[in-house]
């Protein structure tokens, strides 16, 4: 997590309707885990406050969960990738499944793990 938000990402976010911005539940896991393994201190506390603000004030109720449809999409994608000899991190496969099930545009810097997933992807760091 960055101390200062990337200006390209902030500009891209400002151009999106607020109601269109959702977070996959898997991303919340990744963020909470990352904070959980950080050493205690002011940086961790500041980042935890920022994440709580994001979840409670900026995207309240807009969490895209790994439901049955998303799990099915992710499982099919994981099986396809394994058969092709190109497995990808499970968390990214679950995120792809959530995006596929909801027909969402996925904003990520990590295009590589989503190129073959059939998910529409945008890299807001390049805007």
Question: Which ranges hold each PLM region?
Answer:
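Short, well-structured N-terminal submotif of metal-dependent ribonuclease cores
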Residues: 1-27, 36-53, 116, 127
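Active-site neighborhoods of divalent-metal-dependent phosphate/nucleic-acid chemistry enzymes
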Residues: 20, 33-39, 57-105, 109
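Short amphipathic alpha-helical segments and helix-helix/interface helices
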Residues: 10-14, 96, 111
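Alpha-helix/helix-capping structural signal
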Residues: 26-29, 69, 112
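Short, C-terminally biased terminal segments at protein or domain edges
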Residues: 112, 123-127
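Short acidic-hydrophobic, aromatic-tinged amphipathic segments that line or gate anion-handling sites
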Residues: 64-65, 122-124
């Amino acid at each position: 997590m960055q101390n200062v938000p990337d200006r390209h990402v902030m500009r891209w976010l400002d151009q999106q309707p607020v109601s269109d911005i959702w977070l996959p539940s898997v991303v919340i896991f990744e963020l909470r885990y990352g904070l959980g393994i950080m050493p205690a201190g002011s940086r961790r506390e500041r980042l935890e406050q920022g994440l709580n603000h994001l979840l409670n004030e900026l995207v309240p109720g807009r969490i895209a969960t790994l439901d049955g449809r998303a799990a099915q999409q992710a499982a099919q994608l994981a099986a396809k990738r394994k058969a092709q000899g190109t497995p990808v991190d499970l968390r990214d496969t679950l995120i792809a499944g959530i995006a596929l099930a909801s027909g969402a545009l996925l904003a990520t810097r990590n295009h590589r793990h989503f190129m073959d997933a059939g998910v529409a992807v945008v890299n807001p760091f390049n805007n």
